[in-house]
């Protein structure tokens, strides 16, 4: 089977995480299926210099958020799972409560019901009790809550270094290794 991953980009700050995932996966020859929420489109326009077509060109397939009939909305369409990068608290809540009211949340629901890997790069701070409860629910359902916390031990020089390391670590949870996912070798004596 071809390696195939769904990339969801939802409306939290950090659109760059989704773009970096697409860039790293293209270099790994992984077939990507992209779905972008309306909130994510707003974040792209306000936080980045990326043009929509430039981002969409990084994916093998782009699915409109309203297309509930897309291939990724069915469990018979085999994937390695789904990465939502970034994941808004609205998307987290929808996934935690089984609301598949758009293609992004429907695809996440399908990934969970098929017992495939779902990784949510949640972007919010501070957290309230509803956020924590939703994270707990998703974890109990088999999903992975993965806040993109900077790894300062890597001595990042740029924001892109921080983004690349977080995304590479998230992709390693799917068994996808990238140059940015080097293993920690311990501290020098």
Curated annotation (Swiss-Prot):
Q: Which UniProt keywords apply?
A: Flavoprotein, FMN, Prenyltransferase, Transferase
Example of a GO MF term: flavin prenyltransferase activity
Q: So what does this thing catalyse?
A: dimethylallyl phosphate + FMNH2 = prenylated FMNH2 + phosphate
InterPro entries per record: Flavin_trans-like, Flavoprotein, UbiX-like
- For this protein, what is the EC number? 2.5.1.129
- Name of one Pfam family that matches: Flavoprotein
Give the binding site residues for FMN: 11-13, 37, 88-91, 123
Report which superkingdom the organism of origin falls in: Bacteria
Q: Does the keyword Acyltransferase apply?
A: no
The UniProt annotation places dimethylallyl phosphate binding at: 153
SUPFAM superfamilies per UniProt: Homo-oligomeric flavin-containing Cys decarboxylases, HFCD (SSF52507)
Q: What class of enzyme is it?
A: transferase
Q: Which PANTHER family match?
A: FLAVIN PRENYLTRANSFERASE, FLAVIN PRENYLTRANSFERASE PAD1, MITOCHONDRIAL
> What family name appears in the similarity comment?
Belongs to the UbiX/PAD1 family.
The job of this chain, per UniProt, is described as: Flavin prenyltransferase that catalyzes the synthesis of the prenylated FMN cofactor (prenyl-FMN) for 4-hydroxy-3-polyprenylbenzoic acid decarboxylase UbiD. The prenyltransferase is metal-independent and links a dimethylallyl moiety from dimethylallyl monophosphate (DMAP) to the flavin N5 and C6 atoms of FMN.
Protein's UniProt name: Flavin prenyltransferase UbiX
Source organism lineage? Bacteria, Pseudomonadati, Pseudomonadota, Betaproteobacteria, Neisseriales
């Amino acid at each position: 089977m071809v390696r195939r991953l769904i990339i969801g980009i939802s409306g939290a700050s950090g659109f760059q995480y989704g773009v970096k995932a697409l860039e790293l996966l293209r270099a790994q020859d992984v077939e990507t299926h992209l779905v972008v929420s309306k909130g994510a489109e707003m974040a792209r326009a306000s936080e980045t210099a990326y043009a929509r077509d430039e981002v969409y060109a990084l994916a093998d397939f782009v699915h409109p958020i309203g297309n509930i009939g897309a291939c990724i909305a069915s469990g018979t369409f085999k994937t390695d799972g789904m990465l939502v990068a970034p994941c808004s608290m609205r998307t987290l809540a929808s996934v935690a409560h089984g609301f598949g009211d758009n293609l992004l949340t429907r695809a996440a629901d399908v990934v969970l019901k098929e017992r495939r890997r779902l990784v949510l790069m949640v972007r919010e701070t501070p957290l309230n009790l509803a956020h924590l409860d939703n994270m707990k629910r998703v974890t109990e359902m088999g999903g992975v809550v993965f806040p993109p916390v900077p790894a300062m031990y890597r001595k990042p020089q740029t924001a892109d270094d921080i983004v690349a390391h977080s995304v590479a670590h998230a992709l390693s949870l799917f068994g996808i290794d990238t140059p940015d996912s080097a293993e920690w070798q311990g501290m020098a004596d």
